[in-house]
Amino acid sequence: MLDSVKRADVFLRKPAPVAPELQHEIEQFYYWEAKLLNDRRFEEWFALLAADIHYFMPIRTTRIMRDARLEYSGTGEHAHFDDDAAMMKGRLRKVTSDVGWSENPASRTRHLVSNVMIADGPVEGEYEISSAFIVYRNRLERQLDIFAGERRDTLRRNKTETGFEIVNRTILIDQSTILANNLSFFF
C-alpha cells in the first residue's frame, strides 16, 4: 500500500479544527507556491522544498472494488515521479534550459489549490496537509492538458519569509491514463 496513503489516514475522519490563523497561513503559502509555478519562478519555488524533500507521483490503475487498496503504486515501485532534492534540481535545470525541448517554448500553466485540510504531523512543527488541485497547461498552439487530483503534503515550519518548507509531496491524480505528451512541469 502507498506509504503516503497510510500516512494520510488521518484524513479518513474529519481532522480536529486548527486555529484560523494557521489555516490562513498555510493556504497563503500554497497560493504563493502556485503563483511562483505559474510565473515560472522555479528557483524561488525550489527554495520552498526541504533539503530532505520526497516528491512522489504514483501510477494509478483502475481496480475493482475489492482491490481498491492497490489502486496506486507504492514507494519503491514504478511511479511517474519518485524524486529527492537532487532529482528535483535536475528537473529544474532541464525546464529552465534553452535545450530542454519539452519546455521550449514554455508551457503556460495555472495551478488552483483548494479544500485545504490540516492535521498535526508526527513531529512538532510539522503538518500533514490534504489539498485538491487543478493544473491547467497550454503548450504550443493547441496542446491542452488538465490534471485534477489531491496533493498530500508534509509541511515543516521554518524561519524563512514563507514560514514553511515542503518535506513530502504525494500527487494523486484522478486520471489513470495520462494523455499529455509529457510531465515536464511541477504540481
Curated annotation (Swiss-Prot):
Pathway: Aromatic compound metabolism. One of its GO terms (biological process) is 3-phenylpropionate catabolic process. Keywords: Aromatic hydrocarbons catabolism, Dioxygenase, NAD, Oxidoreductase. It catalyses: chlorobenzene + NADH + O2 + H(+) = (1R,2R)-3-chlorocyclohexa-3,5-diene-1,2-diol + NAD(+). One of its GO terms (molecular function) is dioxygenase activity. Belongs to the bacterial ring-hydroxylating dioxygenase beta subunit family. This is Chlorobenzene dioxygenase subunit beta.
